[in-house]
Amino acid sequence: MQFITGPKLNGAAASTGALSPEVIAVYPMTKAQESLWLAYSMAPNHTLYNLSLKFVFNQTEAASDGSIAIRDLTRRHAILRSTFHGANQSQARPFVAEHNPDTATASFRIVPKPRDARGEAKVLGLLRTAVNLSQEFASRWLAVVSDREIELYLVAHHIALDGTSMSSISAELFKLLSGSPATPAEQPFCQAHMYEVITYIVRRFSSRRILTPFKAAFSASPEYQAAERFWLDQVMHVRPYKWITNPSSRPAPSKSYREIQTWFDFSKDDLAAWGSKYRTSWFRVAVAMVGLLTRAHTEPDYGADQTVTVAFGGRPAGLEKSIGHFANAMPIRIPFTEASRKTSGAAQVSFDNLVKLVSKQISTAKKHERYSILDLSRARASRGLETPRAQVAVTLSPKLSHKECTLYPVEGPYDLFFCFLEGDDNVTLGVIYDPIIFSTADVARLKDEFSSLRERSMTDPSFGVSGISGVQSHLPRLLPELDLSNVDEISAARFHAWFEQQALAHPNLVALHSAERNLSVTYKELNERSNRLGHYLREIGISRGSLVLLYLEHGPAVMEWIIAVLKAGAAYAVADQSNPPERIRSIVSVAEPVLVIHDQKGEAIREIIQESPVKTLDIRTVQIEKFSSESLEEVTQNTDLAYIVFTSGSTGQPKGVEIEHRNLSHFVANAFTSNYTTIGPGTRVLQLATFAFDAAVLEWSQCLSLGGTLCFADVPKALVGDYLADVIDLNEVSFMHLTPSVLATLPTSRPLPSLRQISVGGEMVPDNLIKKWRSRVQVVNAYGPTECTVVMAHQPQPIASDAPQPAANIIGAAHQHMKFYVSNDAFTRLLPAGEVGEVCIGGPQVGRGYKSRPDLTENRFAVHPELGARLYRTGDRGKLLGDGSVFLVGRIDREVKVRGDIELDDVERTITDVMPEVTAVSVQPDSSSTSLWAFVSPDDIDGDVLRNRLTERLPAYMVPSTVYALPQLPLNMNGKVDHKSIAANMESLIVEATTSGSSSSATPSLVSSGSTTCRSPSTSSCSDSRSASPAITSAVTRIWQDILGTKGLITTSDNFFDLGGNSLSANKLATQLRSEFSSSNITVLDIFSSPTIQGQVDLLCGSELDSYVQSKLDSLGRGRTKSPAKIVDSQGRSSPSTIPSGGRKSEIAIVGISGRFPGASNPDELYRLFRDRKEGISELEGSSGVLPFPGAIYVPRRGAIKDVEYFDPAAWGLKEDEARNMDPQQRLFMESTLRALQDANRVPSIQGTNNIGLFVGAARDTWQDATETVYGDEFYRTHRADLTPSISARTAYHLNLQGPNVTLNTACSSGMVALSVAVDQLRAGRCDMAVAGAVAIAFPQEGYVTAESQIFSPSGHCRPFDHRADGTLPADGVCALVLRPLDDAVRDGDKIYSVISGIATGSDGRLDKAGVTAPSPRGQADTIERAWKDAGIPMSKAVYAELHGSGTPIGDALELEGFQMARSRLGAANNRCTVGSNKGNLGNCEAASGLVSVIKMCKSMQYGVIPPVQSLERVNPLINPSLPFDIAQTDLPLSDDAVVCVSSTGLGGVNAHCVLRS
């Protein structure tokens, strides 16, 4: 298969000039064309979408003139004489402009057949030249002529023609050349434009099915909605291909452009036979095989699927042979997870089942092929989600009319592109690949594997794919495999052995991970470390039957010790360090451990056990290097103890639930075979529960037995609300188990794209909570008492929004080998299905009993007399359903008699059903037991409304007589509503509710009359806020009292958590503080870091003071960038506070750029200058004359812009003398702003209104110093400086920009500071679009005077980071960026150069600074830290930093120190990062230098490569060699999800930093 490819060529930028007068009709592009237009607009010089057709015929065979045939084709088909344009003032959408068929002339060029390689390269260049779609027709012709034959090429952009059209054109052309006219019936629209096509359709067809493609109503039709549901499902929970091939481990490819390998020629008979084996088309079998083959070469991520892009015809009936672009490339999900079936300890996928599912997907897709990728992108964007990038595609090109024709496929943007090309009797398969990702050897291996797979699929259609190399690691397996139907085999298995086998099978998979700590531990590392710890434990006397108590800080170390204890043959228990001493004492007393393992916080437990013989071990003293990393000999028996979990007892003493090894093994195996979770290799599981609870056992045992990754949070007790969402995003968590109370805090506004499954359990799950989440993720309602080993039943919830939702009371059927029974209360008779009684559980997950409590064990773990088997009595009341599942009614101990038998759980569930706003509820009988009281949260619940709704659902005696609304209900240690505590403290709770006006009378809650601004005259912080802000202190105290449910005295130094606060109440506190103090950004993490009223007042004081200053500035008409609040420590040092990530809503898209630079007249030329490592420095004539001081040196070099004097006044409505009087900075900036707006296709109307902001960083006006004006009268000339409008004001006048307007100067950081102000204004909604720009042009245009050891270079060269660096070099520059909120840009289909995720500015101040002009690493680090926190992206993700890099030896060294200081604060100290600077190419463009760096990053992201620095011999010796930086000395390829950053520093210490992503 042939393929036209090569390096990217230069070409004209996309243009959207005025329409030609020859245009006779315009009509909107199809959605498929719009998506191609968007790709073209972002890279107009690319030829990725060139589709080429080659004809070969003898000179003697050309009966007609080829040019006449081409002319006839051009007249006949409107698309061959059309141009393509972006939306403008008259057209709301991108559109096609059809030109007059009588005057339209096709591009047709004739060249002689080349005789050498140079000539062939020239022809190839002509074939690959990019086309300006708005100025030229999308198709062109090239004839390569020799004496004997003619090679005629038709090269068309894919936006105009698809493969079917090429086939039709080939037939028509041969007819025309042979003198035979095309049959009119074949081409009914041959001379029609689009309006006539529509008329034809309407006249010929009356069915709505045919008309809807031409009606806007399709987007509001049921068909469209059904299509949207289907296509959203195709990309739901799909993940990008993370290729196992490692490009960084091999030499850079010799070619940067895609290449093709021809793999196979298949006969059509063979393909037909292939398809018939699966009762579908061979193409669908091939799509399934491509999906399987590519998955085998990606990193495992079980539970997620990938997509393969498939082109659908998209041609309505009647247009089958029309010429144009109808192909619609859409993602088809390869349902690998759905196809897997769990048997014999492993998930299996049969190929025929996979084909069946793929074929079904494609069949449904064809019904919805009118829905476009643009529709899908917008639908995903509206949900806060991105559409996955197309990485793998499959296409089938139709047969051409003659064997003399050859079709060259488009190159496409894919990593792998499988192209099937139909011939007369055969089909050829060629594969286009990206050599940056795949080597030639990689593709050859893929070819061999494809061939082997196809051969096997021909002989055994139902073969299991787990045997395929690479696929097995994607399927969950319990190793070694065993018969999961055999109870004894499972009982004999061990969790730690399953983990160990995973480590042997997948040593490099990540077992433990923390994104916040930048920590990853592989299975091999965890296994070897736990083996060494196990050997150490055995040496110190720990053996079979021993019990070890772990008293460790929550984190990965706990997991290491749990595995080590189990491997040593012992059992473990965990005492949570946050527990009060009395509970820890009770746990030690019941557990009777032989060893307590502790960390640096072990003093508390050592005091408790000092009188006992229990040994202690401080993990800080353990030396394990001498111990073997080999596995330990297995010594445990099936009935040996594995762990003890402590639950609350009715007497207040904890109950120790004993779980044996066989119980744990059955939980893991039974949950696996019952499809409770979709955990497998690569699945990210959140470690949310404290290790003292059995929910943690669920997390680590399921995860580490099956190859998943257990993910830890830095502050696990704060895992609620936005912090929980942040941790999910940072760690790409896909599975988590949590209580409904915690799930209720998780914001549904966050996209959480990685999250696939939520397991909810531990308490009653409100139906409304399930409804919120089930359409987004797989929700399972999990059930299992601690005494029955975590979970033994689950009820999956349907994902489809229109599917009926089972009642939340239904907990599902028992897992394999487990069984539900329902007994009468006397425990003497088993009840049939439908009768209510006590739910009992039997099976091998039922635990041993309660430690040292034989009486309680005998009562709760009892042999049922009718069954003769040991059951666990749950205390839950419920009934069996016909399908074996259980319907829970409530707790036996919560059944009361109030004018009849009442299940309190039933009333509580009804309350959450009728009022979804209720997040927690406890119903209790009143003190006389004659009525019910309902305690609910939050405190704004209207009790009267709630009771009215209940009367419609419940009998009168079950409706609470009074509703008490509280900020939060008391919770027990498991995070569940503490009904016992509420029952015991009802009087105080009623007083609290009625005092705050939150009883059922629905009186509004008491709120503060208003916040008081804290202003401290002596300090920038409020460290003395006791005296400075009594109102704030009072308000915070009142909020504490409301949340903690106390009216007692609280001092400003009391710890919130010591008074009873927990993670849920901390989330509530942060929310209420933000509500009370609207200017604050307090997060739940701030509550943990500042847990006292005093600390929180300090945080609030800074933000409220900021609000005060901002309001004063606003009243003067001047905005400023809001400074973050400061946290002041005991030494008076300050550090930036946590700035919550804004998420996608705060991200800003760069949609247009322009500029003029030294040696480059536009951004593309600038990128080429960087790529070629050239200098843009100009050699200037003349000298400075008399030098101003001894030792002075005149250097006749400058980074000058060419033709700064050229300007067309008439184009701007200016007179010549008025223009001459203007500072050239103004003139050039006006032009640059206009070009940027044109580049963004966002030029405003001169007549209309808009809200476009303009923010300019400008250097000092030197034009007035260098010239005298003749413009204006004497008064004007006298006050010229005062009467000259600012650059932003004049530009706004001429371009009619009506939004906020600022001109500023902070020296070299001016442009970046202007960018920061623009971003702030966009985020605040003060403008809809913004232009951020900068300009620095000095006059006169001459060299500079310097001296040795001064800031300017005596050598006339700027060499950042180099040992030759001797200073910077002055330069000029002007640039402008057009900015829009990311959601707006995506919605409107803007081209997006880059996305600003975070940005910050800051000043050095006086601390840690040698002088006003000296740089401050601390000041720069503060600003960098703020920017990354604003972005909400881990700094470890930064692959490159474009630094200020001034070329001064000390300045460069200090800047790198500051950058590393910020990285250390943000947990990225050890990640290597590439750094660079553009000043070696250009010099220092002063006010424009920061934005020049941003434009460099934008173009680098567009071209996929960051160029190296201009020159580097050896690194500057002042730079610390231990810093983990690489100076960019070669091209740095960028991935599609690359994150980079830019720093800019102004003389005097004004710093700016921004974070950019692709």
UniProtKB/Swiss-Prot annotation:
CDD domains: A_NRPS, PKS. The keyword Metal-binding does not apply. Residues 995-1028, 1116-1144 are annotated as: Disordered. Residues 27-392 are annotated as: Condensation (C) domain. It catalyses: acetoacetyl-CoA + L-isoleucine + ATP = tenuazonic acid + AMP + diphosphate + CoA + 2 H(+). Residues 1131-1140 have a biased composition (Polar residues). SMART domains: PKS_KS (SM00825). Hybrid PKS-NRPS synthetase that mediates the biosynthesis of the toxin tenuazonic acid (TeA), an inhibitor of protein biosynthesis on ribosomes by suppressing the release of new protein. TAS1 alone is sufficient for TeA synthesis via the condensation of isoleucine (Ile) with acetoacetyl-CoA by the N-terminal NRPS module and subsequent cyclization conducted by the C-terminal KS domain. PANTHER family: FATTY ACID SYNTHASE (PTHR45527:SF1), NONRIBOSOMAL PEPTIDE SYNTHETASE (PTHR45527). This is Hybrid PKS-NRPS synthetase TAS1. It comes from Gloeophyllum trabeum (strain ATCC 11539 / FP-39264 / Madison 617).
